[in-house]
Amino acid sequence: MGLILFTFLISCQQNTALACSDSLNSLNSLHTEEQPALSGDGQFIAYVSNRNGTRGILLFDLKDQKFIDLPRLNRPDAIAENPSISNTARYIVYVASDRGRADIQLYDRVTEQVQVLTAGYRGWVRHPSISPDGRYITFETGSNGQWDIEVIDRGTIELDVL
């Protein structure tokens, strides 16, 4: 962690391409930015940030250098972590913890809806990952007393098209 912080501080001091201000419109800020996920087309990056004292998932458009609104994704009563995004960032899969339980959730930027994918799972879930087209979601589950891999097939109806 010290190396990452050191690299960030050096980059900020040398005024490189990284945006290193406390601005709400910059990729990086003086607050914690972690758990990055890059879209398959390389245009978007989703990550967890602690800006304004609120921990949540942000989506940044690298091409247009601006944040994308994510209505209904971040809730004040839940902690969102470990984002993974589809090819065009239409879908964001992540872990949300509320009511003392972690669930894998899927956010659709087009419909602005959140779907809980692991409701009713026994045990813990962590580290979700989504396929480029948004059809498959993998994650780790501890429901059998050890960490195992699960795959959810969402079918062919909804593909990653904006």
Feature-to-residue mapping (PLM):
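Sec-dependent bacterial lipoprotein signal peptides
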Residues: 1-12
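Sequence signature of WD/YWTD-type beta-propeller architectures
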Residues: 10-162
